[in-house]
Amino acid sequence: MSKALPLVTRHGDRIAIVNGLRTPFAKQATAYHGIPAVDLGKTAVSELLARTGIDPALIEQLVFGQVVQMPEAPNIAREIVLGTGMSVHTDAYSVSRACATSFQAIANVAESIMAGSISIGIAGGADSSSVLPIGVSKALARTLVDVNKARTLSQRLKLFSRLKFRDLMPVPPAVAEYSTGLRMGDTAEQMAKSHGITREEQDALAHRSHQLAAKAWEQGLLHDEVMTAYVPPYRTQISEDNNVRKDSSLASYAKLKPAFDRKHGSVTAANSTPLTDGAAAVLMMSESRAKELGLQPLGYLRSFAFSAIDVWEDMLLGPSYATPLALDRAGIGLADLTLIDMHEAFAAQTLANLKMFASDEFAQQKLGRSRAIGEVDMDKFNVLGGSIAYGHPFAATGARMITQTLHELKRRGGGLGLTTACAAGGLGAAMIVEVE
């Protein structure tokens, strides 16, 4: 085990997460159809500030992320500062780590607090799969640049005449990895086959996720962390995630056809997370600053770790690489955790990671460790459901998971929680949080 790495300031202050909030998550082209991610981000941050009761001028830094970026607002963080009543002098910058984006935002704010650069910051992320940057072909893009430099009408017409009809077709955002050309679902299929994960196991995990999420909503467990969002022109509202299947039936999952390997596959739309819109944010401070302001933190950030692996095989095993590092840096073992929350990009990816957590062979051959970190107690795992049920606005998921885990730890009287996620590009993230 590596030496523990405490997350404290030079004065010994811990990193406090004072509050967290998100919009309800909505499936693509439903409740938030036509609403860009920047507006979803403003909505979540504005309500977070209002609920906390803190003077917006006290926020010294905002770090926010967006995976599917819009060209007209490339720095979503700064737009949120300018649109939510914060001081114009509040520092703001944007980050992107694919599905682990808000994990990165939280880590960056934590590091700024530890360095003494700031004492109060906000971290989070927002994404919209309903408002997308529809592009143009490379041929048309090049022609438009050349046309802009052409001096005469005849020169411009000559440039346009070289284009073919297909060059005029709009180009949607890529769904495949830039480096490999593989879709996430292709990797999930590979992992299912390589690790012997059956269709039945995947469907069972998806069914479990929806059942637990539906139960959480029915019992009112999420109301303190999910706001009501009013949708322009403000005649309608959304108060709950609209992807959760309250009538989930295991038998219904078997009816769906594979979505990626249509002949021999097992990954379906039902055992994968859907395209989703939403935003989430957390308010962070040094422990002493929270006390000065009379604020009671939800909990504290104990450790974090990021990992990077090969993209050609098992690309979504990031949690299995990042989690051991986060545990080491927290000075704890897997058995010390009260809760474990893993991002469910796909049921196949989730189950593969659970297998690797318990695999001595994986630990020895891939991690250089003598033994596995251990088998996950499913009574601790994704106890309120996961991303398959809630949905996955890419940049918002990490902040959702952190906030949700802290609230559940508080309900259980405290303890330690792991939140971990895979991400495109072979990346992984893991964070340990603590509630007293």
Curated annotation (Swiss-Prot):
The active site is at C99, H392, C422. Pathway: Lipid metabolism; fatty acid beta-oxidation. It catalyses: an acyl-CoA + acetyl-CoA = a 3-oxoacyl-CoA + CoA. One of its GO terms (molecular function) is acetyl-CoA C-acyltransferase activity. The keyword Cytoplasm applies. One of its GO terms (cellular component) is cytosol. InterPro entries: Ac-CoA_C-AcTrfase_FadI, Thiolase, Thiolase-like, Thiolase_acyl_enz_int_AS, Thiolase_AS, Thiolase_C, Thiolase_CS, Thiolase_N. Heterotetramer of two alpha chains (FadJ) and two beta chains (FadI). Its main location: cytoplasm. It is found in: Cytoplasm. PROSITE patterns: THIOLASE_1, THIOLASE_2, THIOLASE_3. Its EC number is 2.3.1.16. Signal peptide: none annotated. GO terms for biological process: fatty acid beta-oxidation. It holds the Pfam family Thiolase_N. Belongs to the thiolase-like superfamily. Thiolase family. This is 3-ketoacyl-CoA thiolase. Keywords: Acyltransferase, Cytoplasm, Fatty acid metabolism, Lipid degradation, Lipid metabolism, Transferase. It comes from Serratia proteamaculans (strain 568). Catalyzes the final step of fatty acid oxidation in which acetyl-CoA is released and the CoA ester of a fatty acid two carbons shorter is formed.
